[in-house]
């Protein structure tokens, strides 16, 4: 059975894919994120004892436009992919379906802590102090699982990691841009992702593989450690992506000299612009930091 066939078989057995009356079933508590393709809000789910959930509603026209890029390739939907991701460091997807307006809807675990994006942009050191190594390991393990399942996430960035309360743990979210790691989906031309964290091969419309995620992961970890971008410095906008293969990144130890050098070295190897010089798989990154116990050395 092919990867896509196995995904669809598991999805059918989950009972997902039906109609979801968003306005009747959920009581919105607050809007969490308004993205380029979808809106995400926290709500009480009346069908499940008013438990708090995250609800993602994808804009229909943007969804159709994105999916049209893969016409004829039998691409699994975001819902089909997300339902198959069962890992302690990935936010669980409870159900997927379509709203009464035909919009794709995903109902997922509510993770109560701050987003890594807010922590990094607002330089909230108290959330990360003494916890970076642990959180980075959990992030790496979640990405390793995605890769072992046969996918490329394609949007690894701080916005797509949410901390648990008190930043004791972290979870990966959002499979809206995720694609199978198979030849038809790795051909040049699909330039999607978050520009500040986008690998040169995506920017330049070259062939891709799972190493695009490793680059984005490396940039994300770098920003976690020093609250600066390896190329741009201050995290302001996506234009820095144009420099990802035209100038070298600033060495992490220059900006964070007390960071454990083994962790710093692993992060710098992950974000190398040249694919052949980059960490080849996330398991190698985990191996490189296996003995790192503390964020900083005396």
Description of each model-found segment:
Residues 64-84:
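AlphaC helix of the eukaryotic protein kinase fold
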Residues 116-127:
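AlphaC helix of the protein kinase catalytic domain
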Residues 141-151:
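Protein kinase catalytic-loop region centered on the HRD/HxD motif
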Residues 135-136:
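Activation segment signature within eukaryotic-like protein kinase domains
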Residues 188-201:
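Conserved activation segment of eukaryotic-like protein kinases, specifically the C-terminal portion
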């Amino acid at each position: 059975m092919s990867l896509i066939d196995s995904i669809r078989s598991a999805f059918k057995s989950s009972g997902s894919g039906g109609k979801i009356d968003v306005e009747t079933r959920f009581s919105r508590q607050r809007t969490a994120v308004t993205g380029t393709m979808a809106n995400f809000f926290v709500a009480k789910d009346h069908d499940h004892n008013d438990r708090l959930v995250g609800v993602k509603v994808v804009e229909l026209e943007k969804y159709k436009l994105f999916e049209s890029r893969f016409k004829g390739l039998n691409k699994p939907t975001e819902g089909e992919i997300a339902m198959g991701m069962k890992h302690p460091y990935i936010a669980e997807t409870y159900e997927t379906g379509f709203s009464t307006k035909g919009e794709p809807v995903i109902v997922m675990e509510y993770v109560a802590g701050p987003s890594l994006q807010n922590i990094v942009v607002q330089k909230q050191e108290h959330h990360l102090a003494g916890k970076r190594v642990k959180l980075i390991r959990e992030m790496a393990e979640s990405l390793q699982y995605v890769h072992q399942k046969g996918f490329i996430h394609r949007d690894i960035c701080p916005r797509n990691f949410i901390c648990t309360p008190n930043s004791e743990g972290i979870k990966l979210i959002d499979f809206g841009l995720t694609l199978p790691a198979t030849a038809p989906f790795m051909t040049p031309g699909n330039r999607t992702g978050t520009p500040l964290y986008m690998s040169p091969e995506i920017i330049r419309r070259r062939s891709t593989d799972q190493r695009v995620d490793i680059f984005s992961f490396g940039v994300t970890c770098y920003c976690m450690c020093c609250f600066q971008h390896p190329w741009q410095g201050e995290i302001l906008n996506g234009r820095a992506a144009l420099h990802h293969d035209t100038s070298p990144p600033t060495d992490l130890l220059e900006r964070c000299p007390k960071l454990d050098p083994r962790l710093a070295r692993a992060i710098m190897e992950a974000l190398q612009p040249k694919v052949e010089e980059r960490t080849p798989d996330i398991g190698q990154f985990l191996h490189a930091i296996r003995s790192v116990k503390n964020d900083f050395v005396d």
